[in-house]
Amino acid sequence: MPTINQLIRKGREPKERKSKSPALMGNPQKRGVCIRVTTMTPKKPNSALRKVARVRLTNGIEVWAYIPGIGHNLQEHSVVLVRGGRVKDLPGVRYHIIRGALDAAGVEGRRQGRSKYGAKRPKEGGKK
């Protein structure tokens, strides 16, 4: 434990916070190009085929990004917008692709939580 004099001389040094999404380099989103679009299996006890893409960002860093929602139109060379946010049961996936931006189309037929999936407002009198 330091003395008062030592604290006056040197002071406390704040701990540096480690970023949870370092590839974005402090930006809210980054653009990237899909290198590979594939599926991954989650950790135990979950079971599924989660849709993911290997994306090369504009700063040259390659990351795995999750493709949210049901169905997608992404393929190799698609240009996408990537945000931070990990997928808990997919190790190594620390980013999400933003639906409805650039080449990633919004989710078709989505009625609730539409803004998160880039879905337009459905026409009135459509099917229930």
Curated annotation (Swiss-Prot):
Leader sequence residues: none
InterPro entries for the chain: NA-bd_OB-fold, Ribosomal_uS12, Ribosomal_uS12_bac
Keyword Heme: no
Origin: domain of life: Bacteria
Region span, Disordered: 1-29, 106-128
Gene3D superfamilies, per database record: Nucleic acid-binding proteins (2.40.50.140)
Similarity remark: Belongs to the universal ribosomal protein uS12 family.
Role, per record: With S4 and S5 plays an important role in translational accuracy.
Subunit relationships: Part of the 30S ribosomal subunit. Contacts proteins S8 and S17. May interact with IF1 in the 30S initiation complex.
Annotated HAMAP family: Ribosomal_uS12_B
Stated name of the protein: Small ribosomal subunit protein uS12
Organism: Dictyoglomus turgidum (strain DSM 6724 / Z-1310)
Taxonomic lineage from the root: Bacteria, Pseudomonadati, Dictyoglomota, Dictyoglomia, Dictyoglomales
